[in-house]
Amino acid sequence: MKLYRFMSYAECDKLLKGETLVNSTDHSKKRGTASSAKGFCFGIGDEKQAKKALRRLRGIVSTDILMVFEPKDISKFTPCQGRYVDYEKIDSEGKCVDDYPIGWEPCRMFDEYCISSYSRDDIDIEVLEKDILPTFIVDFQ
């Protein structure tokens, strides 16, 4: 099973240097029923699925680096769920997110995995990609 995580340069640097990353955040206390995760959150899937998920994750996660990996022992990771905007439903209705009042966009629960601490010893990295989002150049002249 492949998992993915969008992360900052700083987080990636620590991970690649062999540090154990620790996050004790109980997301259910911060987001109520919108999340059952504790610690770091990971999406399920490969690079293609991660890039598709980016649409719902933008503004929530740091997108400096995309890491796709195979857990060495999936039992160390806890299944959880997070509630996000359901862009597939919006697209199927022929609408865009701006057609809904703020806070009333269609949402659904997505399966994820979480863990409170991990290091390179816990994962086999398959993909590390930087600059996931396109760079826009605006010419004001």
Each model region followed by its residue ranges:
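Active-site and NAD+-binding cores of ADP-ribose-processing enzymes
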Residues: 26, 62-141
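Compositionally biased amphipathic helical and low-complexity segments enriched in hydrophobic
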Residues: 4, 16-17, 22, 55-58, ...
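ADP-ribose/NAD+-binding catalytic cleft of ART/PARP-like enzymes
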Residues: 1-38, 55
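Short active-site loop/helix that positions an aromatic residue
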Residues: 46-61
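Short, flexible beta-strand-to-coil junctions
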Residues: 6-12, 45, 61, 68-75
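Amphipathic alpha-helical packing elements
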Residues: 37-42, 48
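Active-site-adjacent loop/helix micro-motif of nuclease/hydrolase catalytic cores
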Residues: 16, 51, 77-79
